[in-house]
Amino acid sequence: MKIAFLVGNFPVLSETFILNQIAGLMERGHQVDIYALDGPANHTEKVHPIVEKYNLLKHTYYSPTPPDNQLLRELKTNELLIDNFGRNPSACRKLLDVSKYGKRAKSFKLLYKAIPVLEGKSYDIIHCQFGSVGLMGLLFRNLGLLQGTLITTFRGSDISKYLKKWGDQVYDQLFAEGDFFLTNCEFFRQRAIQLGCEATKIRILGSGIDCSKFAFTPRYFPADGHIRIATTGRLVEKKGIEYGIRAIAKLAQVHSNIEYNIIGDGSLKEDFQNLIAELGVGSIVNLLGWKQQKELIQILDKSHILIAPSVTAADGNQDAPVNTLKEAMAMGLPVIGTFHGGIPELIENGTSGFLVPERDADTLAEKVSYLIEHPELWQSMGQAGRRRVEEKYDMHKLNDELVEIYQQQLNSKSTQSRVEQLTSSVVET
């Protein structure tokens, strides 16, 4: 199959779920082109090994980024029009139609995003990662810039935070005209249905991990009594890391033998540094920054407990069953998450770990303390977590399932086309 992946920025180090799907499709012999509508990811020296192994940048087409300065934007837009208007005059006019597209046309954003597909391209599948990207994919298809079966995956912020900003009707046209939809958990599937998506047009396809890269190790109480607790995730509000830090500060009052390592980076780094200093836990709480997968595995391998205190952010942002939790569970770590978004679909409360209410540092501290005091639970919880991930989130199984979904949609469209042709022939006679 010939497949177009439409994404925002690319490659994003934290979006391994997208990289895994692209690599899986390539391994299965399919052609994948990647369209990064928001341009390259923010500069970082670290590049995910999958990007290099599969030479993904060679298959990536970037939309130019509009300058923030209005004058510079107008100058650059004039250059773009001079260079590209002849490729598709009709589409360029439509993309600049303020009466139809409002601010998106007036700001020239639609034109910028469409530059890589102006001449029109045909695919078997157009797979849009995130609902907001699905809106652009639908627009491109309606303008004749892309042809193919349109599939959109909802992953979290696009069906939580995005709704709060743009309203519950933002996906009405996409639900009506898109061919099929995927989501990574039942929590967000039900939300899509509540918003108007037909239940028969959407199914769950979890975000998978390569279990073979996360070796299972039974956890035992360390001989030196030093307990290492970890959290992995971006330093943003919805990851709830503030409550992890507060819980550890409470815990340190009764357990002097703990260490808390936070792996990740983000906009709240300075806030967390200040909180750590304010609570006086700088000697036991470490902000380690972003780590390559190999480095992450080394840290988790030496850890005993992982906490993921996700919360619903002020902007409405929510989490699905996050891959960082799956990776820790695959490695045998007992985990503590929250009753939040899709997390309860991953963690079996009391079996592979514990769930606590959002923003409840006291209960989080109690559960961590309970695990420290009951190390006999670690091994059984770790084994249950590994089984859960292997059964529901194995990347290779899910990539096979993705190919099956693509094929089902193509077959359905082919059957529908034949029925329409037969109906037309009968009417004519």
Question: Which residues fall in each region the model found?
Answer:
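Conserved donor-binding/catalytic core segment of Leloir-type glycosyltransferases
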Residues: 182, 218-239, 245-248, 261
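Carbohydrate-associated surface elements
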Residues: 187, 208
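Nucleotide-activated donor-binding/catalytic signature segment of Leloir-type glycosyltransferases, i.e.
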Residues: 273-294
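A short, well-ordered alpha-helix in the C-terminal region of glycosyltransferases
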Residues: 281-284, 363, 370, 377-404, ...
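Short hydrophobic beta-strand element within catalytic cores of glycosyltransferases
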Residues: 328-330, 334-337, 347
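Conserved acidic donor-binding segment of nucleotide-sugar-dependent glycosyltransferases
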Residues: 346-350, 354-361, 370-376
